[in-house]
Swiss-Prot record:
This is ATP-dependent RNA helicase mrh4, mitochondrial. PROSITE patterns: HELICASE_ATP_BIND_1, HELICASE_CTER, Q_MOTIF. Residues 19-119 are annotated as: Disordered. One of its GO terms (cellular component) is nucleolus. It comes from the Eukaryota. A motif (DEAD box) lies at residues 353-356. Residues 90-113 have a biased composition (Basic and acidic residues). It comes from Neurospora crassa (strain ATCC 24698 / 74-OR23-1A / CBS 708.71 / DSM 1257 / FGSC 987). The gene is drh-15.
């Protein structure tokens, strides 16, 4: 009878019952398996803290009738597999075909090697493939000079005479070779351009490493568009005729005396180019670069930021002589646009610099409101950043499906010309005293600078940046360094404006800084004494003064966008939380093909494996993930 009941059960049910029994038995024999798996589970990082692995890969081109909406994922029903002739497989997720033959043993070794394990455990992703990097390098070779761009002659002269004045060799950087012709609509290479959006607007992403010249890459096409627009604008042409007639009628009187009584310019409070940046320091920096071009090409650029008085901000925007370009922070411009919506009615070019920061939580509301108000008249939308997190990549795919992605070969990579050193603070002589280790590292740099082979009457002044993770730590570290005879200042949002601008001016200047050597050579003597005790023991503070160094202790406020050409040394007091912070902080050194050095202070609670893999990736020239 049991045999008859057993034969009445089909083979599939019998197999399922056997599998269930074996699984439950295995679970009872190995009760640790579930606990072990759960313990190794890690909390996922937010997408805004994770680098994107498909920066250079645009979304698939949709048909003419599909519009800009993202296709909705429909769940498969019970009969979804019936009457199909084509497999429902996403070609982007399809596995890549394996190579037929391995070229060498090195390929096999690289294939089996699991690199950057600690970085990948932090949910960071790989960058663009090396095949795409090679193709980008080939396209870059077609441009060797600014004369090859379709720019107006006056703009070309402004680049050579003002923007790059003093440089012995004037050549475009990699991002400028790729971005300027794309923004001008100049066909370069074999890569087809993405189609325009439904209203004829063009969207671009400029993703390039820190210190690569992105500011000039988006300013030059914008200035070229301003000058072309002046020639074609009938309102501006008629205003200039009336202004010339008024000058002749007044008989050579200064324009500044009567211009406010004359009719306002058509561009008064109606800029055609808007550049958004996250901080007031970046407003000043971008404005200074734009004014160099404006001095030669004759257009009007004005800054708007919280560091400027409200009365001056009002004059900059509502000046009777008009304004062509505005450089502002998002919150201030969004507030002005809310009270005066017509401010953004004539904007044709909108640039969002440091897009990964401006489209993050703190700035996204103001930034998106500005973009929405400028959309009706917008011709070009340009996003710029040195790091593209996954959150920003998803945002661009949903909001701007036709965006043209312009990436450089070294995206998400720290240049090899920047060397990284690691100091283990947990060992002797520091014994977990990071402040002591930081002061000792700065004294060592000052001691090396005092031994240079230049004139004996002068010594070089080294400008050093120290980065911390917490704003409260900046003042503590700065006070400790000052007590050890080091000229240091804390840079954060509460720092006085005049002191902040004074220190930043010395760090962004391209000119070398030198001081006269003391007669008794007390710098070397003090450095030698400081080196004996790790720069910690001294009873006379005047004897241990280090005059040939200037130090800024800052948070990420100074790690984004500021063009610190004079900085050669960067000290990471705290280990950065993500590779994005590594890229921006170490990117303050080694800018514009200059050498630099980074020093990381690693304590007992820091991730040593992450620091080791970042150092190895920098040595190998690999992109961080």
């Amino acid at each position: 009878m049991w045999k008859t009941a057993r034969d009445s059960v089909c083979l599939i049910c019998r197999s399922a019952a056997t599998t269930t029994t074996s699984t439950s038995a295995r679970a009872s024999l190995e009760p640790w398996a579930g606990q072990r798996t759960f313990s190794t589970r890690r909390e996922q990082r937010p997408s805004r803290m994770v680098l994107s692995d498909r920066v250079a890969r645009p979304p698939p081109v949709r048909g003419p009738g599909e519009g800009n909406k993202k296709p909705r994922n429909k769940p498969d029903g019970p009969w979804a597999g019936m009457n199909r002739r084509v497999a429902n497989i996403d070609p982007r997720k399809a596995p890549k075909p394996k190579p037929v033959e391995e070229d060498s043993r090195r390929d096999k070794r690289d294939k089996n090697t699991k690199g950057q394990k600690a970085l990948k455990m932090q949910r960071a992703l790989a960058t663009i493939s090396y095949g795409q990097r090679t193709s980008i390098k080939e396209r870059m070779q077609e441009i060797q000079a600014f004369d090859q761009f379709d720019l107006l002659p006056v703009v070309k002269e402004a680049i050579a005479q003002e923007a790059l004045k003093g440089m012995t060799e004037i050549k475009p950087t990699p991002v400028q070779r790729l971005a300027i012709p794309a923004l001008l609509g100049q066909p370069m290479g074999r890569k087809p351009r993405r189609p325009k959006s439904d209203n004829g607007r063009e969207e671009f992403l400029l993703a390039a490493e820190t210190g690569s010249g992105k500011t000039l890459a988006y300013l030059v096409p914008a200035v070229n568009a301003i000058k072309k627009g002046d020639a074609d604008d009938e309102l501006v042409a008629s205003y200039n005729e009336r202004l010339a007639a008024e000058k002749e009628r007044r008989g050579g009187a200064p324009v500044s005396e009567w211009i406010e009584k004359f009719e306002p310019h058509p561009n008064t409070a109606r800029p055609r180019v808007v550049v958004l940046v996250p901080t007031a320091e970046l407003v000043d920096q971008v404005t200074s670069v734009a004014k160099k071009l404006a001095h030669y090409t004759k257009f009007k650029v004005r800054p708007l930021s919280a560091s400027i008085s409200p009365l001056r901000n009002q004059r900059n925007l509502y000046s009777p002589i008009g304004v062509d370009m505005i450089v502002s922070t998002p919150h201030l411009l969004a507030t002005i646009a809310k009270s005066d919506p017509n401010v953004l009615s004539r904007v044709s070019h909108l640039v969002i610099d440091e897009a990964d920061s401006l489209l993050d939580r703190s700035f996204s509301g103001d930034t998106t409101s500005i973009v929405d108000r400028a959309m009706p008249s917008l011709k070009q939308l340009i996003l710029c950043s040195a790091t593209i997190p996954r959150r920003l990549d998803t945002y661009m795919e949903e909001q701007f499906p036709y965006i043209n992605r312009i990436t450089t070969p070294n995206l998400h990579a720290i240049p090899r010309r920047v060397q990284l050193g690691v100091i283990d603070v947990s060992k002797d002589p520091y014994r977990n005293n990071k402040m002591l280790a930081c002061a000792d590292a700065i004294w060592s740099i000052g001691k090396e600078a005092a031994k240079h082979e230049g004139p004996k009457s002068e010594i070089d002044v080294k400008r050093i940046m120290v980065f911390v993770n917490e704003r409260e730590t900046t003042q503590q570290v700065a006070d400790y360094l000052v007590s050890k005879g080091i000229d240091a200042i804390a840079l954060h949002r509460d720092t006085e404006e005049h002191r902040k601008s004074e220190m930043l001016a010395s760090f962004t200047s391209n000119e070398p800084m030198k001081i006269s050597r003391p007669a008794d050579d007390d710098v070397a003597a003090a450095a030698a004494e400081g080196g004996k005790a790790g720069g910690a023991v001294s009873s006379s503070p005047t004897r241990r003064h280090l005059p040939n160094t200037k130090v800024i202790v800052a948070t990420d406020l100074a790690s984004r966008g500021i063009d610190t050409l004079a900085v050669r040394y960067v000290v990471l007091y705290d280990v950065p939380h993500t590779t994005i912070d590594f890229i921006h902080r170490l990117g303050r050194a080694g800018r514009m093909n200059r050498r630099g050095r980074g020093i990381v202070l690693v304590g007992k609670d820091d991730r040593r494996d992450v620091v080791a893999e970042v150092k190895e990736s920098m040595f190998m020239g690999q992109a961080l993930v």
